[in-house]
Amino acid sequence: MTQDSRFPNLFILDHPLIQHKLSHMRDRDTSTRTFRELLREITLLMGYEITRNLPMTTRRVSTPLVDIDAPVIAGKKLAIVPVLRAGVGMSDGLLELIPSARVGHIGVYRDDDHRPVEYLVRLPDLEDRIFILCDPMVATGYSAVHAIDVLKRRGVAGENISFLALVAAPEGVQVFQDAHPDVKLYVASLDSHLNEHAYIIPGLGDAGDRLFGTKN
């Protein structure tokens, strides 16, 4: 895991397996089926990294031989909240890693000015919960910021929110950091820039279209 000195709340997950799978996802010739499988696999690997610092406690366990105080995750419960629609493709990998997690959904699309328009919010109970928001891309950053706003308006502290994405543009990361410096952003790659259509360069195209086999 590395950091960029410009963005103190950005963490780049540079594990070789993550980078290998991301390269295949970038390839325009990768099929919808393979793209979907890779998204699940890479999200599982990234989920392993971002849950590294979960608080721990111990629980008395009887092994076949002795009783021990065994380490278990403490207190707070986990919730996975994909940002629709492309974020749905990431929830499977996270649920494979954390099958007991609750799942919410935040529906946001970008209007012609690339601003977020909210159309759905469904969340589990918020008390004593750690939230993992997920969306494959942080381009302008506005959708990510809006999704975090949804949780914070309901009383969730920034320290209890993480945002997981595959690729991000520096412009979007700056918007994210300015709005929510207390929320950690985890990505597989910090890409070069946004083009005139607000697409990440080099990016991986429209993640939702590639995931579901649709055309924009």
Swiss-Prot record:
Uracil binds at residues 200, 205-207. It is an enzyme of class 2 (transferase). Allosterically activated by GTP. InterPro entries: PRibTrfase_dom (IPR000836), PRTase-like (IPR029057), Upp_B (IPR034332), UPRTase/APRTase (IPR050054), Ura_phspho_trans (IPR005765). It catalyses: UMP + diphosphate = 5-phospho-alpha-D-ribose 1-diphosphate + uracil. GO terms for biological process: UMP salvage; uracil salvage. Its cofactor is Mg(2+). Keywords: Allosteric enzyme, Glycosyltransferase, GTP-binding, Magnesium, Nucleotide-binding, Transferase. 5-phospho-alpha-D-ribose 1-diphosphate binds at residues 85, 110, 135-143, 206. Binds 1 Mg(2+) ion per subunit. The magnesium is bound as Mg-PRPP. This is Uracil phosphoribosyltransferase. It comes from Paraburkholderia phymatum (strain DSM 17167 / CIP 108236 / LMG 21445 / STM815).
